[in-house]
Design a protein with these regions (language model features):
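Flexible "cap/lid" subdomain of the alpha/beta-hydrolase fold that forms the substrate-access gate
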Residues: 2-14, 20-22, 33, 61, ...
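A short, highly charged, low-complexity intrinsically disordered segment
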Residues: 294-300
Length: 300
């Protein structure tokens, strides 16, 4: 029997940050300020199963990234440096001077520039099936000749995805979520309610372009990340979580060379979409990560 997922919040709010409008939800009453950055091709709804598990521990800010969901779809500014600045400005506007940040997939790619741009604000980061483009072994994910996925190159091609996917958004997303290599192990983890939202977001005017621009920004991201890495590692505490049937810890080395303090963890019987497949296991890892961070910052 299909059951509808609980929305991440009853209220979607909108705030203008620079030249863009960011849609977001604020959920929870816990003492920890937490920024949750969803992956591709989803929206903030990807965190809906995490919310009830963390709401007593954290005050969660859950945006739709630029180009996704109810956020605006600007013509430019999809490089992760620009998106990181937008996300930090959102947290500042909401009164959060310091916060933890968690990112899945493309949301995780925002964490390194976020930590480098705002070192006094970002207290810890957690990469969920994600890493830092241009560093370590990260580029292998987009190379189909070494086991990577062809969709990286397809999504980066100007205009072609818009021409081919219009009217076929559901077909494409169904393939993305259920592909053999790193797709869902628990096939019903993304239920009809969530899937429909992701399809509608992609099918909205400018939705395909907005989603693809995150991939088209990768050459700029690679250049920016290498420049940031040359400045030295971030002192921010970092966690890397990989799924056994997903990308795994293939990008771990990119994080290890970029942060001073890195821990890692596996989640078993899980594909790429950890927040929707294994929310309880992920929530426990995040709580443990925050406790570890607090133990490091306690004065002797």
């Amino acid at each position: 029997m299909n059951t509808r997922s609980e929305p991440a919040s009853e209220c979607i709010r909108r705030r203008r940050i620079g030249n863009r409008v960011v849609a977001y939800r604020v959920v929870g009453t816990g003492p920890v300020a937490l920024l949750l950055l969803h992956g591709w091709p989803q929206t903030g709804k990807a965190w809906r199963k995490i919310v009830p598990l963390l709401k007593s521990h954290a005050t969660m800010v859950i945006p739709d990234l630029p180009g996704f969901g109810a956020s605006s779809r600007p013509q430019s500014g999809y490089d992760k440096m620009t998106v990181a600045a937008t996300m930090h400005d959102l947290m500042s506007a909401l009164g959060h001077d310091s916060y933890h940040a968690v990112g899945h997939d493309v949301g995780g790619q925002i964490l390194f520039p976020l930590a480098k741009l705002s070192p006094n604000a970002v207290t810890s980061v957690a990469f969920i099936e994600a890493g830092i483009p241009g560093l370590g072994n990260s580029l292998a994910s987009g190379n189909p000749f070494t086991g990577g996925s062809w969709h990286f190159g397809f999504n980066m091609v100007p205009d072609l995805p818009e021409a081919l996917l219009t009217g076929r958004e559901a077909l494409y997303l169904r393939w993305i979520f259920h592909r053999d290599s790193i797709g869902l192990v628990l096939g019903d983890a993304i239920d009809e309610y969530a899937f429909d939202e992701y399809v509608q977001a992609l099918a909205a005017p400018g939705g395909i372009r907005g989603a693809m621009e995150h991939y088209r920004a990768l050459p700029t991201d690679i250049e920016d990340n290498r420049r940031l890495a040359a400045e030295g590692p971030s002192p921010t505490t970092a966690l890397v979580v990989g799924a056994r049937q997903g990308v795994g810890l293939g990008w771990l080395d990119s994080v290890e060379e970029s942060f001073d303090h890195v821990t890692s963890a596996w989640i078993e019987d899980c594909g790429h979409y950890i927040p929707e497949e294994r929310p309880a296991e992920l929530a426990e890892l995040l709580l443990r990560h925050w406790r570890f961070h607090e133990s490091r910052t306690v004065e002797p």
